[in-house]
């Protein structure tokens, strides 16, 4: 079963996010208290634990939030979800708006490993219905 492994926030853009016990998502805004929240298409970022594990296999000491993702998942193939897919995550509803992103500046992880998974395997979403998400919550595809 697909589920949430961790939820993470940061006060500033361009930094690693810190795992927290739960996050509150606000409709058409994102995660309350997170630097990336706002009226745009990348309100929430998701990255699979399986993607993080690829970097661990390269010898990096990385964990949830180190790639600046808000929601770390397991058991769902995020990168192959079409834009427009809706996901029920805990009590919230998210709509996938973007797969991957352009990496304008090479981050510390890129220089350490020569690669980074977030630009290729991270996805972004906007909040359709708000609520709370916490580790252990289920993830369901409700519309493709």
Task: Kindly label every feature range from the protein language model.
Residues 1-144:
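Metal-cofactor-dependent catalytic cores
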